[in-house]
């Protein structure tokens, strides 16, 4: 099998995990999420307790295999407190790098309680996961605000509407219910 360098962003100058030495072997299990330009976003196991999500050269795919294009958003956000960024949100949460309070980032996607972000430029460019709660979204109009809060939200304290869960609908209305 082959081994491929793994980068945190689709850019060979971006930060790499494992102190700059992150690699994946085609002998092991590799989950492919999708393609972005000449890159594949993949996840692979390092140990049973540690995985990594990152980018490899799309030539790693067998010629008869196809990967869908990644559908990532690009929403400006600001980090509201110092936080670690990880390339393994589901298992070890090993830090890839750190962000300080008030750092501007671009939110690309979300997965459970984690948001996939991009920050930095050139050799300090990276993508990784931060807890969604650390981000302050930048909202410029009401329609954007309504889109940003679509879905159901669990309320843990301080609900003045006597509901444990709020659901925000696309038309801007909301409903609340006791769960």
Language model regions located:
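Boundary regions of SH3-family modules and the immediately adjacent low-complexity/disordered segments
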Residues: 29-31, 43-74, 118-152
